[in-house]
Amino acid sequence: MKDKQKKKKERTWAEAARLVLENYSDAPMTPKQILQVIEAEGLKEMRSGTSPLACLNAMLHSNSRGGEGLFYKLPGRISLFTLKKDALQWSRHPATVEGEEPEDTADVESCGSNEASTVSGENDVSLDETSSNASCSTESQSRPLSNPRDSYRASSQANKQKKKTGVMLPRVVLTPLKVNGAHVESASGFSGCHADGESGSPSSSSSGSLALGSAAIRGQAEVTQDPAPLLRGFRKPATGQMKRNRGEEIDFETPGSILVNTNLRALINSRTFHALPSHFQQQLLFLLPEVDRQVGTDGLLRLSSSALNNEFFTHAAQSWRERLADGEFTHEMQVRIRQEMEKEKKVEQWKEKFFEDYYGQKLGLTKEESLQQNVGQEEAEIKSGLCVPGESVRIQRGPATRQRDGHFKKRSRPDLRTRARRNLYKKQESEQAGVAKDAKSVASDVPLYKDGEAKTDPAGLSSPHLPGTSSAAPDLEGPEFPVESVASRIQAEPDNLARASASPDRIPSLPQETVDQEPKDQKRKSFEQAASASFPEKKPRLEDRQSFRNTIESVHTEKPQPTKEEPKVPPIRIQLSRIKPPWVVKGQPTYQICPRIIPTTESSCRGWTGARTLADIKARALQVRGARGHHCHREAATTAIGGGGGPGGGGGGATDEGGGRGSSSGDGGEACGHPEPRGGPSTPGKCTSDLQRTQLLPPYPLNGEHTQAGTAMSRARREDLPSLRKEESCLLQRATVGLTDGLGDASQLPVAPTGDQPCQALPLLSSQTSVAERLVEQPQLHPDVRTECESGTTSWESDDEEQGPTVPADNGPIPSLVGDDTLEKGTGQALDSHPTMKDPVNVTPSSTPESSPTDCLQNRAFDDELGLGGSCPPMRESDTRQENLKTKALVSNSSLHWIPIPSNDEVVKQPKPESREHIPSVEPQVGEEWEKAAPTPPALPGDLTAEEGLDPLDSLTSLWTVPSRGGSDSNGSYCQQVDIEKLKINGDSEALSPHGESTDTASDFEGHLTEDSSEADTREAAVTKGSSVDKDEKPNWNQSAPLSKVNGDMRLVTRTDGMVAPQSWVSRVCAVRQKIPDSLLLASTEYQPRAVCLSMPGSSVEATNPLVMQLLQGSLPLEKVLPPAHDDSMSESPQVPLTKDQSHGSLRMGSLHGLGKNSGMVDGSSPSSLRALKEPLLPDSCETGTGLARIEATQAPGAPQKNCKAVPSFDSLHPVTNPITSSRKLEEMDSKEQFSSFSCEDQKEVRAMSQDSNSNAAPGKSPGDLTTSRTPRFSSPNVISFGPEQTGRALGDQSNVTGQGKKLFGSGNVAATLQRPRPADPMPLPAEIPPVFPSGKLGPSTNSMSGGVQTPREDWAPKPHAFVGSVKNEKTFVGGPLKANAENRKATGHSPLELVGHLEGMPFVMDLPFWKLPREPGKGLSEPLEPSSLPSQLSIKQAFYGKLSKLQLSSTSFNYSSSSPTFPKGLAGSVVQLSHKANFGASHSASLSLQMFTDSSTVESISLQCACSLKAMIMCQGCGAFCHDDCIGPSKLCVLCLVVR
């Protein structure tokens, strides 16, 4: 036994293999089979660390070479080995060739020893070759049928051994191949191949070998003269020798040919080449590019040292093989090609008549003169595609034609193209710096024709330089200029001449010298260029015939090419310009980050910038397809981009993703954003998904939770589809809102830090540090929204998927992933913060589900608001969904949490009943958890105090919290609980939740219009929709909602800033509020300020306003701008300062309170900048307004109903928002004003009011915006949207719809807060935490603005129900239901639930999506998110400033876009609507939100697809926007810049 072991150990591979072949097999075996036997039989001990197969393979090969080798490798097979003693039988056997044994062995030996065969006698060669040939032939004929590949491979290897040399001409001609037979065959094969590949060779202008590959091409080209001879061509040259050697038996035509598996390059080497008869050598040499052959002293051509050993020859050989394998050389194909050529000839006969080999030939000009003269002319001609040489090329177009037609586009064509391109590029780079630039420029800049022509130049040039390549050149040209096919041109000489003349001419940019020089050095490259050029000109695939070089060139050309002519792969450039909005609508992942990058309004640009990966391109292509149909989406996208900022493609993306939905959304959305929401809801859902994808992605990168985002996205997507587009809409809307907000946040957020759109991803990412924390947190705020949106979406969808049980999982794991992580990061921060504050899981649920359900509901609400009628069902779906969410109450608690918030009624109703049920469990659980989890209890006390202080608020907070948190936060139970907790913990948190979340929704809704406005819009939409009566209230609500939004956002910002963890909306709402009064306030305020800031960035103003920009960028101290606001906010500032002092958030809060913008700016330098920026814009109004609003809010939370629109808290929160709101709203309002004077006036009035009511600074902004939004919204959404939103939106949308719509959070909340907090508002406001919470959550608008406001905010939270009641009272629908809701909420979870149901019916969904998403997750995606989004928006606005013009138009809408990107796909439509509605402001606002939601869907879809979001970001050299390295690419330019160029 030991002996055996020892033996086994000592046994060599050769011995083991011999044993196997002797004892275990009577047939040849492959190394793998031998190894299997060795292993099975234990013939050899395998040592670890070695690769047995490689060892065995090496041994077999080395031992099958020499005469003393043990093994024999069957010639025709890939790797079949047998013992040498059995070689004869097997070699003869497989080949079924007699008398092959000796030759086989000889071949083998010959192969093994390269010299053997070389010197073999003629007979030997003949015999060898014959047998080889026979073997190969028979094999190729018989075996190819059965297993040609096998025989080919074996043959190729065997050929190497020599036998193949002869047999597989091109197969593996081993150097020592039998010189005569094998070589002759080789020669003939080459001739044949070359004949066929000649076109390719010239095209590639590479090497003789290539020529072989080219021969086919060339052959075709030459065969253009006589297409049939193509095959005949290489047969004929070979026939002489080949016949002697039975060469005829070699199959040069069919894919079954042994040559298919033969490496021609192995067959043709200098040894085998020189073994060929001299006439064959000369024939083959002419197939090589001129650079690869040398003229000897005797005038004969000689092979250059590298001719057969360069990439061109390799490519030619490979392409020839590929063409052979593709059946290009079969008789049928040749006939077809010939026919096509004939057709070409017929079509181009006039060209034949006037054909000249070179320009001016008939005028008596010499070629040189012609070239010199025509460099310029030809260039023009080339550009026009009317080159005479082109004509000659045309003839060869036979092959070219077929390539052009794509019928014969073979692998080789792309290869050729690639090669040609490579060559072209190489040459261009080196020799044709000018020409290359020109040609490339032309190719790139000029349409494909020009490109093709430009490239043709090089090809032509190269052609003239390649006398031998003459044929090839014409071939190249043929493909290049199929149009110029002429029988005469077919002639190689004319072709060459034509090429020479045309090419140099065609390379007009090349100086004559260059042209002259090029002949040699550039021949190859110019040839490639020509090929490339021809490609672009005729057809990108045309170059295929051109040759490997052309192919190479093609590859390069193709990139620019598609860009130029058609989006083959949807070239980023073309598509960007063409599809920008759609992409945005689609929310391509690409955009996600890139959105900001694109300053232009082209959202796709921005998004495109994001991803240049294949997947991105594909996604874009898809999106483009969808988007193409929706120019309105484009507008929406633009708006969304502006608002979505982050998603850039938010609106557009959403629309696109929706495809049909987008269409609906786009159409209806654009035309009737609100009605469209019918389609929009779905569309919004889808768009939202896309947008979310788009915007989500940025948050992911921001959150670094791309995966999570993806998961969420996928889940959302999954859920979306099954759940309903509405759900998706909801979710996505929310996601859109969140994403839009987030994107906007990210977009704008980064803008704030970076001031660049690209900042979105980068700043978001960058911001992940300190600024990142702020910005990123803003982005995370945005991610928050995003996360909440995204996460929420994901979470929500996850929730949907995971329903109840998944609350923790969904919230925790996936939402955690998407939601939690995202939440942790952005929303995740909210989540994390929340958990940090209260409970990670809870946070996650809150954030995630909150986001999700709310998103859904919000989406619905938004959709409803937007789609009003159509939205209603969605809302109902949302309701159902909400129920689903409720079912997911735990999971969906988050969702519900949002859901209720969006629709206080709904929140009350759904979250109350279910969410509330869940919330009771979750609320206590989550709330408790949150309370337990973090300083939430402390915060809770504050909040609670605020809540309690505002008994209504408290109650409402509870109710609101339940619904708000649950519904608003979409965390149904968790959120509601958290909401309550938040409200309790952060009185404002709850308020924020409803307000923040609801506001988020409103914010989201308004997000586009204004962060605040968005929220207010949501509210406003509901409220406005609810009743014109509440216009004042609407402003109040607006302010409140915006406040809530800003508060939420600011709080988000604050929270983002203050609490990175609780950055998400939920976090913001919950965590920030819950985090700690201070912390919360801080976070809240911070977030809110940030929200404000973001809001501002969202607003055109911020982009426009240097101050805003400064603030956004952080160059301007927040305080600088803060002071004025601070004065205003001073009344509530005391608390705010505390908050701000506590944290930037605190200041921010105070700032927000004191200085809406200040607060907004407080969040971070960026936010501060934003705020500062905004402050300058809105400082007066905002500050005054903020102070007033705050004071008002503080003073008369109830009174501020008008001021309430700027509910003290809200304004406080919104000071930033207000400034932002104001500025943004100003811009937005301007946009909106542009859209609707009422909007503007209302906005301004509201803003003034809001600003006056510092409470409603955000609302002020929001109110203005919301008012703007609300009025139009009022009209459209008011009724329809309001109907649904009255309930759903009634809370949020009413706020959105009417100033109060937002005040549901802002207004409603303000109303509630004002009503409830009126008594307690100042008090809770003082209660920083409560204020913070209200500020952040309810108070994102109200409370977040100031401590006092927070309470009002908190009040708002409950009051939102009450507010909904009051506001809703005021706002027809929202008032009653909301009030009832508020009261119910306050009094009962179920009443709110009923309200929620009510809202859920319509407003809720929209509300939720708008304010909730915007508010709660994003920043109130509108304001708060806008803060987050603001930088993004700023970015976008800045980046998209041109766009922003558009977007500014819908600056508000932009904000909405930003805030509601998470909204329904309608968002895209909405964005479009926004554009439309921007006309009527209110409608616009609602629309935008919806669009934003839509975008969110898109974003979501995109988010999932955008892989670049996690990548490092770099700055665009053109505009300074930031995007991913992949997106910006080697040009160092973002898509926008590329498009512009």
Curated annotation (Swiss-Prot):
- Motif LXXLL motif: list the residue ranges: 284-288
Q: Where in the cell is it found?
A: Nucleus
Motif NEF motif per record, residues: 310-315
Q: Which InterPro entries match?
A: ASX-like_PHD, ASX/ASX-like, ASX_DEUBAD_dom, Asxl_HARE-HTH, DEUBAD_dom
Distribution of this protein across tissues and organs: Widely expressed at low level. Expressed in heart, brain, skeletal muscle, placenta, pancreas, spleen, prostate, small intestine, colon, peripheral blood, leukocytes, bone marrow and fetal liver. Highly expressed in testes.
Q: Which residue ranges are recorded for the region named Disordered?
A: 94-169, 193-212, 393-546, 637-719, 775-883, 902-950, 989-1044, 1125-1145, 1195-1304
Q: What is the annotated signal peptide range for this record?
A: none
Pfam families under this entry?
A: ASXH, HARE-HTH, PHD_3
Q: Where is this region: Required for interaction with RARA?
A: 1107-1112
Q: What UniProt keywords are attached to this protein's entry?
A: Chromatin regulator, Craniosynostosis, Metal-binding, Nucleus, Phosphoprotein, Repressor, Transcription, Transcription regulation, Ubl conjugation, Ubl conjugation pathway, Zinc, Zinc-finger
Q: Where is this region: Interaction with nucleosomal DNA forming a DNA clamp with BAP1?
A: 243-246
- List the biased-composition ranges (Low complexity): 199-212, 844-854
Q: Which stretches are tagged as biased composition: Polar residues?
A: 111-159, 685-695, 1265-1279
**Any one Gene Ontology cellular component term annotated for this protein:** nucleoplasm
Where does the DEUBAD domain lie?
A: 255-364
Taking the record's annotation, the residue ranges forming a coiled coil are none
Q: Major location, coarse class?
A: nucleus
Motif Nuclear localization signal mapped to chain:
408-415
Q: Where is this region: Interaction with NCOA1?
A: 300-658
Q: What superkingdom heads the lineage? A: Eukaryota
Q: Where is the composition biased (Acidic residues)?
A: 98-107
Domain statement: The HARE HTH-type domain recognizes and binds N(6)-methyladenine methylated DNA (6mA). Contains one Leu-Xaa-Xaa-Leu-Leu (LXXLL) motif, which may be required for an association with nuclear receptors.
**Family (UniProt):** Belongs to the Asx family.
Pathology noted in the record is: Bohring-Opitz syndrome: A syndrome characterized by severe intrauterine growth retardation, poor feeding, profound intellectual disability, trigonocephaly, prominent metopic suture, exophthalmos, nevus flammeus of the face, upslanting palpebral fissures, hirsutism, and flexion of the elbows and wrists with deviation of the wrists and metacarpophalangeal joints.
Provide the function of this protein.
Probable Polycomb group (PcG) protein involved in transcriptional regulation mediated by ligand-bound nuclear hormone receptors, such as retinoic acid receptors (RARs) and peroxisome proliferator-activated receptor gamma (PPARG). Acts as a coactivator of RARA and RXRA through association with NCOA1. Acts as a corepressor for PPARG and suppresses its adipocyte differentiation-inducing activity. Non-catalytic component of the PR-DUB complex, a complex that specifically mediates deubiquitination of histone H2A monoubiquitinated at 'Lys-119' (H2AK119ub1).
The name this protein goes by in its record: Polycomb group protein ASXL1
Q: What is the native source organism of this protein? A: Homo sapiens (Human)
